[in-house]
Structures are given as structure tokens and as C-alpha cells.
């Protein structure tokens, strides 16, 4: 398996994010949202979302296509809700409703992309670490002693 260039991983990240953001924005523009299903977002939420995007962009440095795509999917969720918050005055529409106001919940595709991206990202990182476990640092003496006490090592 050849090395994956950073530019290729960046392209996978950007392409997956752009496509999914477009889908999210089309759904938000075409499916009506009940007034109660708009969720207010604070400036703190905006700052945290931008920090998450910066971290996701750094994940393109990990030499894995799967990590890059998963980070792009997760970023699509953050970007989709950031765009919506900007367009709708810090209120994000949630046109997908299960149930009603009293017994139900509302969400949007950006929420789904963010959660799915997180799950994919965890799986991709675990697979990468397991495949490269021979490159991990050996446990130090105190760590080996702790593992023996825990009956793990």
C-alpha cells in the first residue's frame, strides 16, 4: 500500500464536506421548518464549531484516506449548521421532525453528518492505530507494573 499524499487527503476532506453541506442546505431551503424547531445558537457555539473545524482540518495530516473522509463528513455537519446560523440570525432550522412539539424532536442533516462523521472518525482512527500498533512506544516499567496489577499485561 503506497503512501497517501497530503494533497489527496485534503481533496477527499474538502470534497466530502462540500457535497454534504450542499445536500444539507438544499434540504433546509426546501423543507419547511415549524417555528418551534429553530434552535438558537450562541457566539460560544460558533467559536466552538470553528475550533472543531480547525481540528478536523488537522486530521488531514494523518496518513489515512478513511480519516480524511470521516473528518470531511463531520465537518460538513459543523459547516452546514454554521451557514444556517449565519443565514437565519443565529437560529438553525431543523426541518426533519419525528413526533411533535410535545413528544418528539427535530434535527437536520448537518446534525446527522456530524454524528456519523464522529463515529466514522473513531472507527477509522482505531483501525489505523491497530494496523500500526508495532510503531507504538513500548510501555515504561511503571506502566507494565500497572498493567500486571490490573491483570491486563
What are these regions (language model features)?
Residues 1-153:
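Alpha-helical transmembrane bundles and membrane-interface segments of multipass inner-membrane proteins
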Amino acid at each position: 500500500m503506497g503512501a497517501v499524499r497530503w494533497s489527496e487527503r485534503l481533496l477527499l476532506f474538502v470534497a466530502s464536506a462540500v457535497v454534504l453541506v450542499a445536500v444539507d442546505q438544499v434540504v433546509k431551503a426546501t423543507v419547511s421548518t415549524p417555528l418551534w424547531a429553530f434552535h438558537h445558537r450562541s457566539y460560544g457555539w460558533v467559536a466552538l464549531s470553528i475550533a472543531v473545524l480547525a481540528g478536523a482540518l488537522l486530521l488531514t495530516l494523518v496518513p489515512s484516506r478513511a480519516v480524511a473522509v470521516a473528518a470531511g463528513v463531520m465537518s460538513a455537519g459543523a459547516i452546514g449548521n454554521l451557514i444556517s446560523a449565519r443565514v437565519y440570525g443565529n437560529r438553525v432550522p431543523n426541518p426533519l421532525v419525528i413526533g411533535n412539539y410535545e413528544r418528539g424532536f427535530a434535527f437536520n442533516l448537518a446534525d446527522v453528518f456530524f454524528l456519523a462523521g464522529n463515529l466514522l472518525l473513531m472507527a477509522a482512527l482505531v483501525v489505523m492505530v491497530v494496523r500500526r500498533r508495532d510503531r507504538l512506544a513500548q510501555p515504561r516499567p511503571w506502566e507494565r507494573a500497572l498493567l500486571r496489577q490490573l491483570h491486563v499485561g
